[in-house]
Amino acid sequence: GLPENLPIIAAGGDKQCETLGSGCFKHGQAVISYGTLATIAVTSKKYVQNKNFTYYTWPSSIRGAWNPEFNIYRGYWLVTWFCRQYAKEKDFPDLINEMNEKAKDIPPGSNGLFVYPFWTPHPALYPLAKGAILGCTDYHNKEHLYKAILEGIAYALKDGLHLIEKDTNQKIKELYVVGGGSKSDVAMQLTADIFNMPAKRLQTHEVCAIGAAINAGMAINMFLNEEEAVKNMTKVSKVFYPIKGNVQVYDDIFNN
């Protein structure tokens, strides 16, 4: 059904297209994808390899580059798991909206509730890990658990970022956040606080298609380079800045 002579372009993997579509192609930039599989990735002009496969290095959608990527297999799948405990399928959006509103009033650290997010073990980093919810008291309710899940995922990705920073010899200073989870103000703010850097939300949270479109545009000479394409197709809609008091709390939790 495709028209004759229509160019067919191989764009790259989904997360690699997300990295390009987010505008993460310079030294010191990283992109978090809060999807079913949660990832943090950078673009590197130099090939790096983790011998234990703690993270994977994929061919980038950007010419002459690579994408080191650390992932949590059960990322925002845990939000779906949470919803299944408290709502029917049709009520998921209503429950998430309610949780995002109530979680705004919960302090960093979720009043001592901690979620270890490895419902599926990480084969290299934590091969024997199992998910855990720690610190429960009669004070906690579902919004505490919701926020603790988001915090636990961000802690785990920060763990992976440290490994990538060391191997690629770069310090990340600029963070883009994409995927369905980026629609949550609570998720965006705690990400800025846990990583202690501005977290940028893009106008379009599903940037995989944008990255693929950029690859197609490059192939038919629509753009001079990736930078021009990103400038024309990707916009930052809001930046969340770290809150000093929250950063101190999260640093204490992460380091201990």
Where are the model-predicted features located?
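Alpha-helical transmembrane segments that form the membrane-embedded catalytic/substrate-binding core
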Residues: I8-E18, V207, A212
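Short beta-strand scaffold segments in enzyme catalytic cores
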Residues: C17-L20, A38-V42, V115
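Short loop-beta-helix segment that forms the pyridoxal 5′-phosphate
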Residues: L2-A11, R201
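Glycine/Thr-rich phosphate-binding loops that ligate phosphate moieties of nucleotide
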Residues: V42-Y55, P59-N256
